[in-house]
């Protein structure tokens, strides 16, 4: 069948209206190709009289009325499977790493339905991260969804990189990294770090363990809106082969923001705080596809920017509903110099249940949170009256809470170049043992600075000898 042609009748920024013969209008989400140009347009609305409204997936510089456009008759398709490993691609699956074309023999549409209810497979298995605060108070589930929430500059990307370092390297499966509207520099750093660690095998790309899809800050909103779907499509194809996949998204907020820009360009009425009226539906459509089936699993870790540190903002609030574990990064904790700046009282996990993690882990985590909560309540009294006015048992709580707070810090492998101290991976059993000793009072004689930036509790004892 001959491909149908239309012509551009209006261009307003990234929004392009194209006129087709009335009886041959493209369907919503069909990809249109501009003649003599690599630019792709995606149909968003049918306006009637043969005119469709599209979003340009690329720069619309130089577009003018009258240019011819061809309807491909299908949604955007991208290469999937082994050919994507070790490669960096854009939203359309074109390589941007200057290492030759990507094999297109296996492709998939970026718009797909979520798996049916009877295909889903819930998981109770824990995923050890080697980061004490996460393993203790908000453990991750294999095949679960995790959100890293935080404002600007509290360490979302560094935490994400450490998780990739600890899980992706130890994890024998494959990873997909979607850079959605983030800094190009970070994407470049990530690629080189993966190459240095051997996760990307530059000699033999097929032996690599990660596929990367980037739609950076400087790209048009259409690219940033669809790049998460491109990454997800690659992850789904690996899952459907029966593999366990790690899917990293940095940053899911930029996906929402791109949706807001596209919505405004299409002339939709904004809803609360200027977000698109379809915010919940767009987020749901993406998140429902990130799931584990009886064939394979997708474990997803998503960084979520929190505008103005307000967790009630519609964008992070909508994301919360879809997650199994939430890791909340706090500016107050970062200000104390405690990294990772995870708030152990705000962070939650569905896995923190005695039937999943075991009675000992559950009790230790709750005792740690209880001690920190009591310290939080006493801080106002300490600020006004000082430590001397506290009851002896409260003084003990404060001393233990400060030790716990410092023991929750940990040197990261990916931050070695900044801190100069080697990174530490702490097994879950050691994490539980360490915190159990602190809450039981076995470390009451140690100075609190001995607990700062160490791995296991044994290192704290060693450090205490040097401090003394």
Swiss-Prot record:
Single Gene Ontology MF annotation: ATP hydrolysis activity
Matches recorded under SUPFAM superfamilies: C-terminal domain of alpha and beta subunits of F1 ATP synthase, N-terminal domain of alpha and beta subunits of F1 ATP synthase, P-loop containing nucleoside triphosphate hydrolases
Reaction equation(s) it catalyzes: ATP + H2O + 4 H(+)(in) = ADP + phosphate + 5 H(+)(out)
Annotated localization: Cell inner membrane
Entry keyword set: ATP synthesis, ATP-binding, Cell inner membrane, Cell membrane, CF(1), Hydrogen ion transport, Ion transport, Membrane, Nucleotide-binding, Translocase, Transport
Membrane topology (UniProt): Peripheral membrane protein
GO cellular component: plasma membrane; proton-transporting ATP synthase complex
EC number per UniProt: 7.1.2.2
Residues that, per the record, bind ATP: 150-157
Subunit architecture: F-type ATPases have 2 components, CF(1) - the catalytic core - and CF(0) - the membrane proton channel. CF(1) has five subunits: alpha(3), beta(3), gamma(1), delta(1), epsilon(1). CF(0) has three main subunits: a(1), b(2) and c(9-12). The alpha and beta chains form an alternating ring which encloses part of the gamma chain. CF(1) is attached to CF(0) by a central stalk formed by the gamma and epsilon chains, while a peripheral stalk is formed by the delta and b chains.
Its job: Produces ATP from ADP in the presence of a proton gradient across the membrane. The catalytic sites are hosted primarily by the beta subunits.
PANTHER family according to UniProt: ATP SYNTHASE, ATP SYNTHASE SUBUNIT BETA, MITOCHONDRIAL
UniProt record similarity statement: Belongs to the ATPase alpha/beta chains family.
Name the record gives this protein: ATP synthase subunit beta
Source organism per UniProt: Acidovorax ebreus (strain TPSY)
């Amino acid at each position: 069948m001959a491909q149908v042609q239309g012509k551009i009748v209006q261009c307003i920024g990234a929004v392009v209206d194209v006129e087709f013969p009335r009886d041959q209008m493209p369907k919503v989400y069909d990809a249109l190709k501009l003649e003599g140009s690599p630019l792709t347009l995606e149909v968003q609305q049918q306006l009637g009289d043969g005119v469709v409204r599209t979003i340009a997936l690329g720069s619309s510089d130089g577009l003018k009325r009258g240019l011819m456009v061809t309807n491909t008759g299908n949604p955007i398709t991208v290469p999937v499977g082994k050919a994507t490993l070790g490669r960096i691609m854009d939203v359309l699956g074109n390589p941007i790493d200057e290492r030759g074309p990507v094999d297109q023999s296996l492709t998939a549409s970026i718009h797909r339905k979520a798996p049916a209810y009877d295909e889903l497979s819930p998981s109770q298995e824990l995923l050890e991260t080697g980061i004490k605060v996460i393993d203790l108070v908000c453990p991750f589930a294999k095949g679960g969804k995790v959100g890293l929430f935080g404002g600007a500059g509290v360490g979302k990307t560094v935490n994400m990189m450490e998780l990739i370092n600890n899980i992706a390297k130890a994890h024998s499966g494959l990873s997909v990294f979607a850079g959605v509207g983030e800094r190009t520099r970070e994407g470049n750093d990530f690629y080189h770090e993966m190459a240095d660690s051997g996760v990307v095998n530059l000699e033999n790309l097929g032996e690599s363990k990660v596929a990367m899809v980037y739609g950076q800050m400087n790209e048009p909103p259409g690219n940033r809106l669809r790049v998460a779907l491109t990454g997800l499509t690659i992850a789904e194809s690996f899952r459907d082969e029966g593999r366990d996949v790690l899917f990293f998204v940095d940053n899911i907020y930029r996906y929402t923001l791109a949706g807001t820009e596209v919505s405004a360009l299409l002339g939709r009425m904004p809803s609360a705080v200027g977000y698109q009226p379809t915010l919940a539906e767009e987020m749901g459509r993406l998140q429902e596809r990130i799931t584990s089936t009886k064939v394979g699993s997708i474990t997803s870790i998503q960084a979520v920017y929190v505008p103005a540190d307000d967790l009630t903002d519609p964008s992070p609030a909508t994301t919360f509903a879809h997650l199994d574990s939430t890791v909340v990064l706090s500016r107050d904790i970062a200000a104390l110099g405690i990294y990772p700046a995870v708030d152990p009282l705000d962070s939650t996990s569905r896995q923190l249940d005695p039937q999943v993690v075991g009675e000992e882990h559950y009790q230790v985590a709750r005792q740690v949170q209880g001690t920190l909560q009591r310290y939080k309540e006493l801080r106002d009294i300490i600020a006004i009256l000082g430590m001397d006015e506290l009851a002896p048992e409260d003084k003990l709580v404060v001393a233990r809470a400060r030790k716990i707070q410092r023991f929750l810090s940990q040197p990261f492998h990916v931050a070695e170049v900044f801190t100069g101290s080697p990174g530490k991976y702490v097994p879950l059993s050691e994490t539980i043992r360490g915190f159990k000793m602190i809450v039981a009072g076995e470390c009451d004689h140690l100075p609190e600075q001995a607990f700062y930036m160490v791995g296991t509790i044994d290192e704290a004892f060693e450090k205490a000898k040097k401090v003394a």
